[in-house]
Amino acid sequence: MASTDGSPWFYPDRVGAAPGDTISIHASGPGGPCRLIARRIGAEETVCAEYPGIEVATHPIPEHADALGCGWPAAFSFTVGEDWPTGYIDLELIDETGSSTHHFLCCRPAAPTTGRALLVLSTNTYHSYNYWGGANSYANVDDLAEGLDPAAARNRAIGKLSRMRPFAQGLLAPPPGAPRLVNLTLRGPGELVIPGDVDWILEHAPSAYDGSAGFLQKWEHRFVAWAEANGYELDFACDHDFEIPGGRLLDDYGTVLLVGHSEYWSKHQRDQLDEFVDGGGNLAIFGGNTAYWKVRWEDDARTLVAHKWKGELDDERWAADDPDSEATHLWSHPAFDRPEAQLTGLSFLYGGYHRLAMCVSRGSGAYTIYRPDHWALEGSDLYYGDLLGAGVPLLGYENDGCPIRFEHGLPQPGDGLGIPRDLQIIGIAPAALLEPPDNPYGEIIPPENPEVLAAIAHGRADPTGIERLNRGHAVMASFGRGDGQVFNAGTTEWAHGLA
């Protein structure tokens, strides 16, 4: 993943901004003039500004640009216009041959808009999956593409990722028709699973990580397009905005929305969202795998530190049995005493994949409804035992859940890290964190370290603990925390069920 294809590659010096802020564009290309187009993407595309005549010189790609950044000089700067609408801004740099690449900017409103909810774009997750320069927090994706054994490629994942580099285009700006991460059709007896659109995959050869993050053609894009088409106007911010020193991002909002795949949270983000809900705010999560990994930003918020399950081994902030509040690992790690379910109500540790590869490969793709009288289902014409979303399918990819016990035929929250005792479970479906160990079709979903996950989720890293990871549930639920309320749809795929 380098700029040897002759395209003009670039990155902005910030990804969150408001009207009046100045953005510097750092770029390298084959030489010659380029133009930058800034488009606001929602139900419609709106050109906010176009800047022609940008001279872009050729600069080397340094070694370890994935971790250390490119260090290219600024080629151009612009000021976010006072008339730019809040939202996701696609930045496209185009050279005189028509070759182009994309980056992005999240434009906040100049001031909170009365009566609007705030949608927080999951940009920490975008950065964690970005493999421009070679590696991301999952693998060395370039080495994987060149034929390195998948396990060896995963061992070359990096725990520090620079924001000061371009984005892998298959991740950030995929070709039209990018498929969902779900088995759209049920496999027959003895058949291989068909994850997504095989013809599209064969034509475009995406990496294993391209479908897991980003805005365009994914969950947030679909949600925003639906909301705007139906008359719902939103304000926008992004994960990175929580790193603004002294910032109070959520003040003056009554509702915060998270959509799709908000997987990586810093302490600053968690602190503000905890305070927001405790103070009476409403948090609506239309996503899955939410707040799973604890991360931090360093170097003036230019470097994302995400050691993930290797935090105890590789993170210099980790002290034996007493990591400071900025150390990285699972939010559910007992050393932090702050599992994500205390805020979200659910955890991916107790959920998993549904209808993806061999994880619940013949699942219904739907929630079975147990509490049709819940306020979230008012006017839905759903009844006990009905399936919600089977025709979509609503469930796929990643789903959050909780341990479950039954009382008088109704699911109740069982014992789990941070799971609220007053959690109201609306619907459930089976989910699994790992593909079956006796799976004859080969591995499709790259596994995390199951021993670490089992030890944290179930207190044991032996085969019994690991087996429990494969008996999870996707859960749709709500609960009250402090003076606020939390609704959690429990699946990354919720936006695909909107009609």
Question: Where would I find each of the regions flagged by the language model?
Answer:
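Active-site-proximal beta-strand/loop segments in catalytic clefts of secreted hydrolases
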Residues: 94, 120-124, 239-240, 258-261, ...
